[in-house]
Amino acid sequence: MRSLNIKKVIFITICLLTFQIGISCTKDENVNNRSDYQNPKSWYKSLNESQSSKRADVFYIAPTCIFDWKDSSGQLLHNMDINNERQRAAVNGAVVLAEKLFGDSCNFYAPYYRQITIESWYLYPHTEWQKRFDIAMSDIKSAFDYYIKHINNGRPFILAGHSQGAKAVIELLKSSMNEETYKRLIAAYPIGFSINQTELDQNKYLVPAQDSLDLGVIIAFNSVIDNSGLSPMLKDNKVCINPINWKTDETYADSTKNRGTVFIGPDGSIVSERAGSIAAKINKEHNVLFVEGASADKYYVPQIKLLFPKGSFHVQEFNFYFRNLQKNVIDRMHSWYNKRY
């Protein structure tokens, strides 16, 4: 029964809710309209009521949470309608997990955006995929601009995202960062996507983390059981840090150093927590984490097998290293304040 409950949480976390396939809505939608981030409804309603009371912020970008869907005229659409309550509910499962991780130490802000659908990723990185993703990024850029100008109020901040959200974080660092804003960037956590050498060479704000305390860096990794779990989307990836021991070489991080693997329910409550269960070591050939202590069968999500085959732990990456990541956010925040003042 416990295993069954965890599997349910996994599906909620990644938002692979099969009822989203082909849903129709009761009114006309137009996903071509840019989202309005002056409207509070365009933002996730935080579980934490004391927004802006902490010393640092996190700007979080959700992963892919919806499938292709039809509007009331029968048109098949490939981007989220952020005003659709069922689609918002699908996104919230992933956002609740992220808020639980980042929100204990930071003010938590997460925009709803016209993210692309699961099916759109089968086209990556072709022109049609890019057209759809450009719609998503136009929202993210607008939301980030509004956040910096009207919400941040000069505080240090963290950028974070998983999967599609990680890709969006990477693109924000490429296109929407400047020196003044970068001075306040504690770190970025684009987890669950790839970064190639050309991107690193051509973008000065894409700086891979080397330890647990460096600042203005990107903390990125992808988790698999072995080569069988490698995703085609990880091709040419060059960035990986081990979130258990914060090494970038092949030093093995045994499970005793894992502070806690945590699974969260849709209401933010902890469904299960276990310290010392997951170990990991970087494989330098592919720049991914090889994970020990997790079952490929248990965490397999067949709905995304073409993107992430059995043996990939893409869905569980926040969960597996939850307490280590949570502590690292605090450690880097303290490091930022110690170096600035």
Please place each PLM-identified region on the residue numbering.
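Gly/Ala-rich beta-loop-alpha elbow adjacent to hydrolase catalytic centers
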Residues: 161-165, 169
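N-terminal low-complexity, Ser/Thr- and acidic-residue-enriched intrinsically disordered segments
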Residues: 25-86
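Bacterial Sec-dependent N-terminal signal peptides
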Residues: 1-28
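Active-site catalytic motif of lipid deacylating hydrolases and related acyltransferases
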Residues: 63-155, 296-319, 323-341
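Surface cap/lid and interfacial helix-loop subdomains adjacent to catalytic sites
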Residues: 136-153, 174-322, 326-331, 335, ...
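Loop/turn elements at helix/coil->beta-strand transitions in domains of secreted/extracellular proteins
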Residues: 54-56, 104-108, 153-156, 183-187
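Acidic helix-start/capping segments at beta-turn-to-alpha-helix junctions
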Residues: 114-118, 162, 192-193
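A structural signal for short, well-ordered beta-strand segments and their strand-loop junctions
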Residues: 58-60, 108-112, 159, 187-190, ...
